[in-house]
Amino acid sequence: MERPVRVKAWVEENRGSFLPPVCNKLLHQKQLKIMFVGGPNTRKDYHIEEGEEVFYQLEGDMLLRVLERGKHRDVVIRQGEIFLLPAGVPHSPQRFANTVGLVIERRRLKTELDGLRYYVGDTTDVLFEKWFYCEDLGTQLAPIIQEFFSSEQYRTGKPNPDQLLKEPPFPLSTRSVMEPMCLEAWLDGHRKELQAGTPLSLFGDTYESQVMVHGQGSSEGLRRDVDVWLWQLEGSSVVTMEGQRLSLTLDDSLLVPAGTLYGWERGQGSVALSVTQDPACKKSLG
């Protein structure tokens, strides 16, 4: 059975994994992939997927380069800020020394493909691309990147039309990319609702990712096909699952695996996140 994990203590214990050349380590790898990423790590490649990604910066800032509605844009995610990247947005994370960030994504459906692209200079013309079924991005990216650096396209800076798809396997997103938000400031602005026991959504209901903030109160749930990740931001709570009571105190996290019935009691002063990513709720990329 899953046990609570204190996030900052876990990060400290695994700090060596956030340095080059690895730069990341998974906390959970089930239906939800909960990972922490460090640096320095600067990249030229852009990743594209049919699911969404949640970013939160624990230590220091990062830069996320995106292709938004046909134009390049730099999104700075500062320490303490949270951000939701829509599905189908080409993105290239740039991370710096002495930084650590949380990234949450989900297991791919068997029908979904990921893409890795390089563009010609600062244009939106595709120089090189590979589409693949993603099982472990950490091990699958390196061979593709090496293939690019050994390619004629890399040497000449010119694409080979015969190796580019006329159309990608799925349409790129036409949604605008949101601005990152300071989580602490958001909490301060919604304390009355949270104290009244009203769960609040950070990003609304137009995404498959549901990042909910819970104040005091109780709830129970059973998500048959998706994991639920809980993170205690303030105060304490108690989760009951599989006949056991698990106490969560400040900075504790807990993964509730898919198909697990759980109850959640949150006392006065409790503030906690719950995160799910349900592909059954996928939105149109248009």
From Swiss-Prot:
One of the GO biological process terms: quinolinate biosynthetic process
Name of the protein in its database record: 3-hydroxyanthranilate 3,4-dioxygenase
Pfam families on file: 3-HAO
Record-listed E.C. numbers: 1.13.11.6
Chain's role: Catalyzes the oxidative ring opening of 3-hydroxyanthranilate to 2-amino-3-carboxymuconate semialdehyde, which spontaneously cyclizes to quinolinate.
Residues binding substrate: 53, 95, 105
Principal localisation: cytoplasm
Residues annotated for Fe cation binding in this entry: 47, 53, 91
Species name: Bos taurus
Pathway field: Cofactor biosynthesis; NAD(+) biosynthesis; quinolinate from L-kynurenine: step 3/3
NCBIfam families: anthran_nbaC (TIGR03037)
